[in-house]
Amino acid sequence: MEKVGWYQLFNGKDLSGWVQKNGTAEYKVENGEIVGTTVLKSPNSFLCTEMEFENFILELEFNVDSQLNSGIQIRSISSPLIMKGRVHGYQVEIDPSFRAWTGGIYDEARRGWLYTLAQNEPARNAFHQGEWNKIRIEAIGDTIRTWIN
C-alpha cells in the first residue's frame, strides 16, 4: 500500500471537485465553510467529492442543525443502473437527536444500522449539540473506525 500525505478535499473558496447527487438541497460556500440547506419534501441529498479513495483517513469539523439528520458517506456509490442512481453505502452518522449516535455506521439505502452507539455512552457524550465538532474517520482495508472530538 502506497502512503500518500494529507490531501485537502475542500479549497475553502468554491465547490470545485464536488458534485451534488440526489435530492434538491442547496450547497454553497460561506466564509470558507460548506453550508448545506435542506429543502422540505426533497429526497436525501449528497454532496460528493469527484475523487475516489481506497484506504484513507478523513478529518473534518462540522456543525449541524439540531432538527436535521446528516452524515458522511464513505465507500459509497451512485450508479444509474442501481436504485436509479441513489447514493448508497456506508455513512458515518451525524445524529443531533436524543439518541446521540454521531459516529455510528449506517448502511445507507441497504442494510440499515451496522454499528449504533447504544452501548457506548462515552461516544454518545462526545458530540456537542450546537457547537463545532471534529470527526476522524479511518477506513483501512475492511475496518472502519470513527472518533468524535
Regions found by a protein language model. Give the residues of each.
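Carbohydrate-interacting regions of secretory-pathway proteins
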Residues: 1-149
